Amino acid sequence: MGWWGWAAAAAAAAAWVAVKVLEVLWWRPRRVEEHFARQGITGPRYRFLVGCVREMVALMVAASAKPMPPPYRSHNVLPRVLAFYHHWKKIYGSTFLIWFGPTPRLAIADPELIREVLLARADRFDRYESHPMVRQLEGEGLVSLRGDKWAHHRRVLTPAFHMDNLRLLLPCVGMTVLDMADKWRAMAEADKSGEVEIDVSDWFQVVTEDAITRTAFGRSYEDGKVVFKLQAQLMAFASEAFRKVFIPGYRFLPTKKNTSSWKLDKEIRKNLVTLIGRRQEAGDDEKLDGCAKDLLGLMINAAASSNGGKRSALPVSPITVNDIVEECKTFFFAGKQTTSNLLTWAIVVLAMHPEWQERARQEVLDVCGADGVPSREQLAKLKTLGMILNETLRLYPPAVATVRRAKADVELGGYLRIPRDTELLIPIMAVHHDARLWGPDAAQFNPARFAGGVARAARHPAAFIPFGLGARMCIGQNLAILEAKLTVAVILHRFEFRLSARYVHAPTVLMLLHPQYGAPIVFRPRSSSQPTCEKMNPLTSS
């Protein structure tokens, strides 16, 4: 073949690549826009390669620059937290099309459509592929797995989160909470004002980290603490890097923080592999008398069964050491952040609404008596506190949105035709704040709406989805609620509290919902007569 032959072949190859690129970046987006336009669904126009990302970022940045104005009686935070959704909903309605690069995302807020996507027709949808930087942080465990492998891991891990198993962990969690309360009291008594200002968002990270470590590692708790301290450092680096996620190729640049992040990730993996090896050599028995089943033990036993013992009926590959490492990382990120954020917002809203703070405190005093530390049975009787936590989750859900991807062409609601590979954006916070579902006081803090239970709180059962819905519902929700109830009950019994003058109400999203400027709260001990954690063993009385 002469030079002209090679030139012709190269030209043909270049033309083929150009056609494929144009198909993905231009022709397909145009066809998708036309497809939804014929159904009466529009949105901001697709821009070549970048989609709507620039507009989304600009709207979010502008919203996050302005805190909520005091006094903080309204919780209408949706325009700040999901600024792009709030802005475009006013223009295009509650169902509209946006573009994450060349990928179409259809925003849906109708609870009946959401129920179909997450529950009735969940087999037609996958969790979308998250950004590699997010996967480094959250691990490639249960949250991001799909298909048979996800189902296998879910079945293996579920026993660790059964209520009877979690109750075995509560005494240890209670000791951690009491230790925190003792430190707060000592700090307040050391100040001549008799009060202390605490940024609860920082302290609750420590409390939830302890519970997560015990649930994940059980009798390997001390070794697990070392691993999760490294994971906390990695979270700090990754969270900062995530702010630059829209800079192409940023995660590959050998910056000082990226290099530190890579080293930490390697060290975490090395320590976890060593810990797993020790447990395997020791012969892990998940049924030790009086001990809770832990995530690590369940995974090791499942790996042993699939590699030489009982075989799974599912056509999945065996659980490997790397799978166990990823599940530990996932559980630390998802569990720690979800519970600490719930605790933070619960204390913030109770500080904003002293009338509900007093009602909850009176319930704790009536149910728990002088000790103020609820037993296993008493936790179930704290109905008002449960209502407050549900209302907190409604107004300030940990994840403000979730995304699913259509695995094939699908029709929803008998009228909405969705092409394959379209992503569906479910704006959880928008659904939680919808006055059509929750009434005219949807932006107000009113725990009484949950007095008849979650099912009767709104006009549709899928209107309240802080932990998701269906088979992929958060596996750790029972742990989060139990830990939050226990922690808030102890705080209510021992302290009165209010917002610090320095508090700025600025909910913002960095993967999960958190207070942009922290959560400084002023605590005043109620009396000096409550027992300290050295004087009592919590959660043993009935």
Swiss-Prot record:
GO terms for cellular component: membrane. Plants overexpressing CYP734A6 show a dwarf phenotype, characterized by abnormal leaves with stiff, tortuous blades, undeveloped leaf sheaths, no flowering and bear seeds. Over-expression of CYP734A6 causes an important reduction of the levels of the BRs castasterone (CS), 6-deoxocastasterone (6-deoxoCS) and 6-deoxotyphasterol (6-deoxoTY). Its main location: membrane. Belongs to the cytochrome P450 family. Signal peptide: none annotated. Induction: By brassinolide (BL). This is Cytochrome P450 734A6. It comes from Oryza sativa subsp. japonica. The keyword Iron applies. It is a single-pass membrane protein. Its EC number is 1.14.-.-. GO terms for biological process: brassinosteroid homeostasis; brassinosteroid metabolic process. Cytochrome P450 involved in brassinosteroids (BRs) inactivation and regulation of BRs homeostasis. Is a multifunctional and multisubstrate enzyme that controls the endogenous bioactive BR content both by direct inactivation of castasterone (CS) and by decreasing the levels of BR precursors. Catalyzes the oxidation of carbon 22 hydroxylated BR intermediates to produce C26 oxidized metabolites. Keywords: Growth regulation, Heme, Iron, Membrane, Metal-binding, Monooxygenase, Oxidoreductase, Transmembrane, Transmembrane helix. It is found in: Membrane. The keyword Transmembrane helix applies. InterPro entries: Cyt_P450, Cyt_P450_CS, Cyt_P450_E_grp-I, Cyt_P450_sf, Cytochrome_P450_Monooxygen. SUPFAM superfamilies: Cytochrome P450.
